[in-house]
Amino acid sequence: MFEDYLEDSNYFAVKASKTNNERESKRYYRAAVFCTMSAVEAFINYVGDVLSQAEILQSYEVAFLTDRKFDISGGTFQILDQMEYHKLEDKLKLLISKFIPDFSFDKTPSWSRLFELKKLRDTITHPRQDVDETDIAEYRRILTTGLSSAIEIMDSLAKGVFKRPLRKKLLDLSVTDNV
């Protein structure tokens, strides 16, 4: 599913860049932002599901990645049969720390750019104003760097977890300047 979302994001970004109608352009950019962040979340869920079968991680790490509630009862770790959603940022940090050991959260530009996109997504999802005040150039900038950064991080994780990169058609979305 994450692949479809990445392609959808690129599709909407291209549509946004080709229209002269500001309202329509913002509509497409918002859709692209949602699709990009949904792609990241879907990818993390996919990785978590695969790792839950692989017995590579500790049970509490798998529970965390797969949004399972866990507890310590009587000094014993237990995975409960309940959902408990965990922050995307925390899941990414866990996976990156495990599978991309040389990744620097402070120095890798893709990390801050991805979370700049997430911040925009959160602003759209939980608006504090009546009107979308983000201008077209800002949408374009944040989405262009955010989509590219999402793909870069996902590709690095794919190489670390699966020992192979993302498909070329996805990698090409980050290098073409269609947006």
Please place each PLM-identified region on the residue numbering.
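Terminal, compositionally biased low-complexity regions
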Residues: 3, 23, 52-55, 70-81, ...
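Charged alpha-helical initiation segments
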Residues: 1-34, 175-179
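Short, hydrophobic, well-ordered secondary-structure elements
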Residues: 26-51
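Amphipathic alpha-helices that form helix-helix packing interfaces
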Residues: 9, 16, 32, 39-43, ...
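Flexible secondary-structure boundary motifs
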Residues: 55-127, 131, 149-163
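Hydrophobic packing residues in well-ordered alpha-helices of helical domains and bundles
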Residues: 25, 29-33, 114-117, 139-143
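Terminal alpha-helical segments
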Residues: 1-17, 47, 51-55, 59, ...
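Long amphipathic alpha-helical segments
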Residues: 53, 133-134, 155-179
